[in-house]
Design a protein with these regions (language model features):
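Conserved polar/disulfide-associated segments of primarily extracytoplasmic proteins
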Residues: 267-370, 375-379, 404-405
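Surface-exposed amphipathic alpha-helical segments
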Residues: 263-266, 367-410
Length: 536
């Protein structure tokens, strides 16, 4: 009944002492006025859930759009406000109903027992503590006012224990609520999809606040207590956010590639077998990164692979692994990790809505590294995350090169390990470094044609054309019918700018191995170049 008929509590109140649950305790309170703050909060919770349902089914994308806590959006996109808005959202009606009922019971009792500003500060501090626990444990999506409810229960438990001498047993007895709290926690830990860390954070905040909260009949200490609670919660939450904001360096030893990633991004292999990472969110909030090494066979600038990706994967209007392509730009020159690269952008309609895509093609000798980033258009702050990832790409020494160096050192004077080391260096775009071990291998095994071919290619790719042509000629002497030696002669003539002579050499190589598809394609390409050239 409101207003309350009695405002005074004493141990001598009528009735025998008896243990009551928290739900029963609310109705018998006689402190303070109507619990307006609790009633307003409950009304807001119901109203927001009703508005969300009126807008459509309350799925994951809807919750994200309305402000659910999602670790990647809080940490990566800087949307810290989600740590507040998540409390006002609920998955479904049973979730909402349970929270509102317990909030009306425990929250009303606490609001009438304590000063309203202390109660409001408890709600704010508990909300932050709940999200700190949730974020510290998992970056997943979380919603609900359960943490506030646990905080109210925890504060009532401690207050009931501290002031049991002045509070009649029929009005409040902390031991009565302990089994209920334990049952709720047990249900949470044994259920799927329950934010137990958030619940525990709220409960601990309430228990701690209960140590400092005082009933209305105690002297008023002003704003010191409520401000202190909120400041402490802000500091703790800020520490958790800062700790989750630390990036990590992900290194692929096989590729010799290092990329900085937000701490909570998860590694996986996508449907195309590529090394991939994502922020762990499905649908609307999903951001991804994938890397793949493409064996090009020839050194280049990555433009061939960029256009192939544009024409085969990002076909306008056609579906792709990342979504339906709406718009794609032409490849442009870029720099990644100190290397020249090709970059293109695309706009897609992904599973969660409009999505941006950026693909980078970074040549490394006979390989091209394809780095693909996608991020949701709904969260433009993710562009800064992608830019940072690109800026911190580093190219390290791949494991295959380290192993080749180690073998060459372990067996000094052996031509095989030196030949292998030189070949790896050349294929990784280090022809100048490849010359020395290949030259030594040729000296140790002069009749080995493959080594001479590798040496010729290393000279030519290092822009030492005449030395490369000399090495190609010597390879032809030791292997007159070896297609590799003949092909080295083709490369020599191309380096000299003599396309016609290169075609003659290529025809010779084709006679030796007419079934070689690579030589056939090269001959076709050279004939096309000659036909397109102006006649003199």
């Amino acid at each position: 009944m409101y207003p309350p008929q009695k405002t005074r509590l004493s141990p001598e109140e009528e009735g025998q002492p008896r243990l009551l649950s928290i739900g029963q305790s609310a109705g018998g309170m006689r402190l303070g006025g109507a619990p307006w703050l609790t009633l307003i909060l409950a009304t807001v919770l119901v109203g927001i859930h009703g508005a969300a349902r009126a807008a459509g089914p309350v799925g994951l994308d809807t919750l994200l759009r309305w402000g659910a806590k999602a670790g990647p959006l809080v940490v990566d996109a800087g949307q810290v406000w989600r740590l507040v808005t998540a409390h006002f959202l609920h998955r479904d009606f049973p979730h909402l109903a349970l929270n509102v009922l317990v909030l009306l019971a425990a929250g009303s009792g606490l609001e009438r027992l304590c000063r309203r500003r202390d109660y409001a500060a408890l709600l704010v501090a508990a909300g932050l503590a709940t999200m700190a626990g949730s974020l510290g444990s998992s970056g997943g999506v979380s919603v609900g006012a359960s943490g506030l409810v646990y905080a109210c229960v925890g504060a009532l438990l401690v207050l009931g224990r501290r002031h049991r001498a002045k509070l009649p047993a029929r009005w409040m007895s902390s031991e009565a609520a302990v089994p209920t709290v334990l049952v709720f926690l047990w249900m949470g830990w044994t259920s799927v999809g329950v934010d137990n860390a958030g619940h525990l954070g709220g409960l601990l905040a309430g228990l701690l606040a209960g140590v400092f909260l005082e009933p209305r009949w105690h002297p008023d200490t002003g704003w010191l207590r409520p401000v202190g609670m909120v400041v402490a919660a802000v500091v703790v939450t800020g520490g958790v956010v800062a700790e989750r904001s630390v990036w990590r360096m992900e290194r692929d030893d096989g590729f010799g590639l290092s990329v900085a990633l937000p701490r909570d991004w998860r590694g996986d292999v996508d449907g195309q077998g590529r090394r991939a990472f994502s922020n762990g969110l499905p649908g609307r909030g999903r951001a991804t990164f994938s890397a793949e090494a493409i064996e090009a066979g020839e050194p280049g600038d990555g433009s061939v692979q960029a256009r192939q990706f544009q024409q085969e994967v990002l076909v306008q209007g056609a579906p792709s692994p990342e979504g339906r392509t709406l718009k794609v730009t032409e490849p442009v020159a870029a720099r990644v990790g100190g290397r020249s690269a090709q970059r293109l952008h695309a706009e897609l309609e992904g599973p969660g809505g409009p999505t941006h895509l950026m693909a980078l093609f970074v040549p490394r000798g006979e390989w091209v590294y394809r780095l693909v980033f996608t991020w949701p258009a709904a969260y433009p702050a993710y562009r800064e995350v992608v830019d940072r990832m690109v800026a911190e790409v580093r190219f390290d020494e791949p494991s295959v090169l380290r192993e080749a160096r180690a073998r060459a050192l372990l067996v000094p004077g052996a031509p095989g390990p030196l030949r292998a080391l030189g070949g790896v260096l050349r294929r990784l775009g280090l022809p100048k470094e490849a010359v020395a071990p290949l030259s030594e291998s040729v000296r140790l095994a002069p009749a080995h044609v493959e080594t001479r071919v590798e040496l010729a290619r290393a000279f030519l790719e290092a822009s030492r054309v005449e030395e490369g042509c000399h090495a190609a000629a010597e390879a032809r002497v030791y292997g007159p019918w070896d297609t590799g030696a003949l092909e080295a002669g083709v490369r020599c003539e191309l380096s000299r700018g003599n396309v016609e002579r290169a075609l003659e050499r290529l025809v010779e190589a084709r006679r030796v191995d007419p079934q070689d598809a690579r030589l056939r394609a090269a001959e076709l390409a050279l004939r096309t170049v000659l036909e397109a050239a102006p006649h003199r």
